[in-house]
């Protein structure tokens, strides 16, 4: 038998949207698969919390659930469900279309029904940059961020009124009679035209505050600092971003919080250049090493590794170290580490060194010649031969 959605989130049946959202965020952070790898029970609880929030955050679905239970929201009842979990994107889903690696507020929770009219105005979104090393990108990492932002005023529970919801500090707006709207009806040759605008007296809230909170001056929010912890999956790249729903600035007088968008930046690396999933490293060899072959230790993202260089390697040759690059964000493969060979030529020689090199220069093996694949006639030369 399916568990009760209110029990899953740990809230009462008369819980407000704000309480439901807060409970869901707590459960999601506690049971998120990134925080509980290889824990099937935590993954199941995360899915249950997500399913419960999808229903209880939607006024229409919640009404059907309250009236008919699970039958009211299961497939085929009351219009059916749109697919489990599709109403939101969590930190894994942000990479689905990855220009959206980090995309979307849970449960479409920014929308509000008519019963929530007057719960303040939404807070603005925040954008921050997160700088990562290639090593962190390769392994995935957990980062702590300290944010300067608007926080909900604790003194008034975000209402802007002294004493919060428990106080008798609100009265119906006399201008709009609590509707939050001003309707103006005019007549034209086409009939009646109704113009609806937010009430300027109560700013569309339908109520006015009689006694303002001293701490926030009636805004329901104060400036402060908040620390958050985020899990960055392996394989992200410059320009990707994470979106954490409801982690932006708190709204005015109980309005929903904005989102937090975390944009990924890659730190320059002392050894490597990135090209997609591959990384490039420049290997400098002396002339004898290139001619005779050698074994060298080269840096990789996992530490030093031994590389064997065959005799006669040419400058510009690309050597490949398989699976030493970066992982694919969606887990479908691993890049390689590419080694660009550079042959170093000495600029100052002793008389003895000049004599040795002069002797070598006379031998046929030291005369430059093109690689085997270049000894064939070019396409244009072969075409020319046909018509000559």
From Swiss-Prot:
CXXCXGXG motif repeats lie at residues 153-160, 173-180, 199-206, 213-220. Keywords: Chaperone, Cytoplasm, DNA replication, Metal-binding, Repeat, Stress response, Zinc, Zinc-finger. It holds the Pfam family DnaJ. Zn(2+) 1 binds at residues 153, 156, 213, 216. One of its GO terms (molecular function) is unfolded protein binding. A zinc finger (CR-type) spans 140-225. Residues 27-50, 58-73, 113-124, 362-376 have a biased composition (Basic and acidic residues). GO terms for cellular component: cytoplasm. Its cofactor is Zn(2+). InterPro entries: DnaJ, DnaJ_C, DnaJ_domain, DnaJ_domain_CS, HSP40/DnaJ_pept-bd, HSP_DnaJ_Cys-rich_dom, HSP_DnaJ_Cys-rich_dom_sf, J_dom_sf. Residues 4-69 form the J domain. The J domain is necessary and sufficient to stimulate DnaK ATPase activity. Zinc center 1 plays an important role in the autonomous, DnaK-independent chaperone activity of DnaJ. Zinc center 2 is essential for interaction with DnaK and for DnaJ activity. Homodimer. This is Chaperone protein DnaJ. It comes from Salinibacter ruber (strain DSM 13855 / M31). The lineage of its organism: Bacteria, Pseudomonadati, Rhodothermota, Rhodothermia, Rhodothermales. The gene is dnaJ.
């Amino acid at each position: 038998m399916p568990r009760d959605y209110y029990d899953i989130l740990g809230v009462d049946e008369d819980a407000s949207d704000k309480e439901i959202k807060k409970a869901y965020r707590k459960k999601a952070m506690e049971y998120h698969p990134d925080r509980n790898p290889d824990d099937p029970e935590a993954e199941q609880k995360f899915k249950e919390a997500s399913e419960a929030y999808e229903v209880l955050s939607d006024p229409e679905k919640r009404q059907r659930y309250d009236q008919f239970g699970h039958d009211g929201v299961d497939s085929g009842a009351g219009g059916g469900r749109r697919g489990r979990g599709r109403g939101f994107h969590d930190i894994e889903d942000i990479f689905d279309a990855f220009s959206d690696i980090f995309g979307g507020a849970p449960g479409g929770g920014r929308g509000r029904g008519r019963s929530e009219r007057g719960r303040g105005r939404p807070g603005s979104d925040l954008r921050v940059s997160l700088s990562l090393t290639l090593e962190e990108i390769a392994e995935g990492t957990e980062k702590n961020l300290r944010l300067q932002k608007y926080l909900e005023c604790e003194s008034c529970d975000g209402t802007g009124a002294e004493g919060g919801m428990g106080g008798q500090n609100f009265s119906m707006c006399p201008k709009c009679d609590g509707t939050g709207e001003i309707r103006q009806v005019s007549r034209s040759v086409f009939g009646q035209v109704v113009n609806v605008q937010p009430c300027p007296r109560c700013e569309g809230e339908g109520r006015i505050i009689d006694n303002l909170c001293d701490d926030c001056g009636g805004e329901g929010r104060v400036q402060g600092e908040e620390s958050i912890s985020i899990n960055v999956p392996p394989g992200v790249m410059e320009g990707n971003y994470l979106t954490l729903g409801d982690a932006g600035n708190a709204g005015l007088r109980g309005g929903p919080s904005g989102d937090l968008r975390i944009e990924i930046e890659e730190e320059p690396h002392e050894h490597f250049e990135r090209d997609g999933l591959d990384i490039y490293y420049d290997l400098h060899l002396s002339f004898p090493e290139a001619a005779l072959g050698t074994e060298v230790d080269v840096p990789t993202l996992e530490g030093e590794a031994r590389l064997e260089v065959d005799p006669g390697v040419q400058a510009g040759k690309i050597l490949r170290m398989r699976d030493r690059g970066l992982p694919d964000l969606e887990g479908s493969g691993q890049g390689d580490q590419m080694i660009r060979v550079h042959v170093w030529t000495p600029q100052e020689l002793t008389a003895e060194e000049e004599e040795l090199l002069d002797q070598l220069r006379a031998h046929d093996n030291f005369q430059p010649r093109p690689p085997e694949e270049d000894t064939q006639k070019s396409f244009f030369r072969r075409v020319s031969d046909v018509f000559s």
